[in-house]
């Protein structure tokens, strides 16, 4: 980190890159003794962006530590924002992963899930610890997401790889084929007959 003083941070306020209160929090942390106490997910995300802008590893570490704490109180209203923060910054949080796995059906019914890109959907659903009663539940989550997305055949194939087709009945496959656009149907049939599968833990 290059040397800077308080006035350098004050100058940032005039550039309108970061909020004034965020700059003040960073200034007091870097040059004072104030700790980061905010529980605002949005503020923590902006603080982390500022820490990266300043190349201040100490501030980054403190923000991550605080986000880890806030993550313990994650809910359906903020899960996607928190998830995006960790994913975009190459970070992991076991509590976040556990929350997603245990509440997958509720999460997949949110608008935030339907707006995710294909990589995020795969990241969320391709997990052996997801708690579901049957694999068809996961397939329906993917189908609902596809209703809101127009993806190419490569992305369709990619997202379908999260399905353990060994646990899908032919009747369930037939129902799924009826729900998807015609251009995907042959691909889905082919994937089913390949029986690509990995273990899945089911909630009995």
Curated annotation (Swiss-Prot):
Using the record's annotation, list all stretches that form the BACK domain.
95-177
Q: What keywords tag this UniProt record? A: Early protein
- Which InterPro entries does the record associate with it? BACK (IPR011705), Orthopox_C5 (IPR009177)
Induction info: Expressed in the early phase of the viral replicative cycle.
Family per similarity comment: Belongs to the orthopoxvirus OPG030 family.
For this entry, the protein name equals Protein OPG030
Q: State the encoding gene.
A: OPG30
Q: Where is the signal peptide?
A: none
């Amino acid at each position: 980190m290059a040397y800077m003083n308080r006035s350098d941070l004050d100058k940032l306020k005039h550039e309108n890159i970061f909020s004034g209160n965020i700059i003040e929090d960073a200034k007091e942390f870097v040059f004072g003794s104030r700790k980061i106490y905010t529980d605002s997910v949005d503020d923590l995300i902006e603080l982390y962006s500022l820490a990266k802008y300043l190349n201040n590893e100490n501030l980054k570490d403190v923000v991550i530590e605080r986000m880890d704490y806030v993550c313990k109180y994650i809910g359906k209203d903020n899960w996607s924002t928190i998830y995006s923060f960790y994913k975009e910054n190459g970070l992991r949080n076991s509590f976040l992963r556990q929350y997603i796995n245990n509440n997958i059906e509720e999460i997949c019914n949110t608008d935030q899930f339907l707006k995710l890109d294909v990589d995020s959907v795969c990241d969320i659903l391709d997990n052996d610890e997801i708690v579901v009663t049957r694999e068809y539940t996961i397939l329906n989550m993917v189908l609902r997401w596809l209703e809101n997305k127009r993806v190419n055949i490569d992305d369709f194939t990619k997202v379908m790889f999260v399905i353990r087709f060994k646990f899908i009945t032919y009747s369930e496959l037939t129902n799924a084929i009826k729900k998807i656009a015609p251009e995907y149907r042959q691909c889905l049939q082919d994937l089913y007959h390949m029986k690509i599968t990995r273990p899945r833990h089911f909630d009995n």
